[in-house]
Amino acid sequence: MLIIIRPSGEIALKSPRSRRNFEHTLANNIRSVIKEGKIWRSQGVLFLEVNDNNKNIEELSKVFGIASFSPVMSIKSYNNNLEDIINKAKEVFAEIVKGKIFSVRAKRIGSHNFTSLDVQRKVGEALYPFSRGVNLENPEVEVFIEIRNDVAYFYYKIIKGPRGLPVGVAGKTVVLFSGGIDSPVATWMMMKRGSIPVILNFNLGGSVHRKFVLEELSVLRKWSGGHKLKLFIVNGTDVLIKLSQIEKRNRVVMLKRVMYKVAERLCDKANAKSITTGESLSQVSSQTMTNLYVTEYGIKYPIFRPLIGFDKEEIVELARKIGTYEYSIKLPEYCAISTKARTSVELNEVLKDEENLNIDYEKVLENSEVIEI
C-alpha cells in the first residue's frame, strides 16, 4: 500500500533548513507510529509504503504535522502518455463512480504535453458511462489524479490529519497535570505546537487519582507521534499538611505556587524550557489575573496557558475530541482545598507564607514516582 502524506501548510512556509528539519522529524514520528514500511520526502509531500494489512494506518490521523493523507495507486507515465492515465483511471475509479454523480480533480507538478484541465476532461469522459452524471460544484464522489513528473497517483479518499507541528520540533515543556478536564487538553495543545510534554502530577487522591491520570496519559500517548511520556507523581498530601499552617483563604494559590516551584526544578532536571498549565482566565478564584500574577511571581521559566481564552464548553468539546473527557469527568476536583479562596491574594502575604513554610522543592521532586508511558 502506498500513501501520500501532506504536511501541515505552515511547514511549507518555513525556511528550507527548518522545513527539512520539520519534515525529518515528521517522518521519524510516522515511523514510530506505523512501526514498519518505507518513507521518503518528495516535492513537499511524504510517501509511505507499507504492507496492505497494516492496521496502524488510521493512527496517522493523530500524528501532528499531517494536514491530510490518502491511500493511492500509481503508474509510471512514460513520454507523457495521457492514454495511460485515462486507462488506469478507468481501472481504479469505474466502481467508485458507478451510479453516482462525480467530479474529477487533477493537479500536476513538472512538464507535460497536456494540462490539468485536459486530464479532468478526458478522464471525466472515460468515467461518464459508469456514472449517473457529472457535477463539478456538488458531486456525490470526487476522484483525484495527481501527476508528479512521470508518475501519476490515483485516489478518492482524503483523510484529515490534526495539522499542527511534529512533536519534538519545539523542545520540552513541563505540564502541571491535575488530571481534570483542562490539563489533558492543554497538554494536547502543546503537543500540537511541537512540544514534548514532561508530566508533573501532584497526587492528592491516592490510587484513584493515579489510575485516572495514567488512563488519560495513555490516550494522550496516541497523539505523541511515538514519543514516550514521562510522568513524575509527587505525594501531594505531604504538601497539604504543610499548607494547613497558613490561612485557608491563601491555600489554593499557595498550592499552585508550590506546584510552579517544583515544576521549575523539573525544568532544570529535564532540560525543559517552559511550564504549561490548563488555567483559563477567571474560570475559578485561583485563576483571576491577580492570582495568576501572584502564582507565577519569580518563576524563571515562561509559563504557557494554551486555554487562557477558552470557556469551559470549548474545553470540554476538545476533551471529547481528544478522548480524555470520559476519564477526566470521573476525577474529583482535588485542588479545591478551600471553600473561601480569595480572588485577589496579596503577593506580600504569599511570599511571607512561602518563607515560613520553607518547603524543600528539590526534595519534593526527588521523592516523586517516575513512570514512562
From Swiss-Prot:
GO terms for biological process: thiamine biosynthetic process; thiamine diphosphate biosynthetic process; thiazole biosynthetic process; tRNA 4-thiouridine biosynthesis. One of its GO terms (cellular component) is cytosol. It is an enzyme of class 2 (transferase). Pfam families: ThiI, ThiI_fer, THUMP. Coiled coil: none annotated. It is found in: Cytoplasm. CDD domains: PPase_ThiI, THUMP_ThiI. The keyword Nucleotide-binding applies. ATP binds at residues 176-177, 201-202, 256, 278, 287. Pathway: Cofactor biosynthesis; thiamine diphosphate biosynthesis. SMART domains: THUMP. Signal peptide: none annotated. It catalyses: [ThiI sulfur-carrier protein]-S-sulfanyl-L-cysteine + a uridine in tRNA + 2 reduced [2Fe-2S]-[ferredoxin] + ATP + H(+) = [ThiI sulfur-carrier protein]-L-cysteine + a 4-thiouridine in tRNA + 2 oxidized [2Fe-2S]-[ferredoxin] + AMP + diphosphate; [ThiS sulfur-carrier protein]-C-terminal Gly-Gly-AMP + S-sulfanyl-L-cysteinyl-[cysteine desulfurase] + AH2 = [ThiS sulfur-carrier protein]-C-terminal-Gly-aminoethanethioate + L-cysteinyl-[cysteine desulfurase] + A + AMP + 2 H(+). GO terms for molecular function: ATP binding; CCA tRNA nucleotidyltransferase activity; tRNA binding; tRNA-uracil-4 sulfurtransferase activity. Keywords: ATP-binding, Cytoplasm, Nucleotide-binding, RNA-binding, Thiamine biosynthesis, Transferase, tRNA-binding. InterPro entries: Rossmann-like_a/b/a_fold (IPR014729), ThiI_AANH (IPR020536), ThiI_fer (IPR054173), ThiI_N (IPR049961), THUMP_dom (IPR004114), THUMP_ThiI (IPR049962), tRNA_STrfase (IPR003720), tRNA_sulfurtransferase_ThiI (IPR050102). Its EC number is 2.8.1.4. Residues 54-158 form the THUMP domain. Catalyzes the ATP-dependent transfer of a sulfur to tRNA to produce 4-thiouridine in position 8 of tRNAs, which functions as a near-UV photosensor. Also catalyzes the transfer of sulfur to the sulfur carrier protein ThiS, forming ThiS-thiocarboxylate. This is a step in the synthesis of thiazole, in the thiamine biosynthesis pathway. The sulfur is donated as persulfide by IscS. HAMAP family: ThiI. PANTHER family: TRNA SULFURTRANSFERASE. Belongs to the ThiI family. This is Probable tRNA sulfurtransferase. It comes from Saccharolobus islandicus (strain L.S.2.15 / Lassen #1). The gene is thiI.
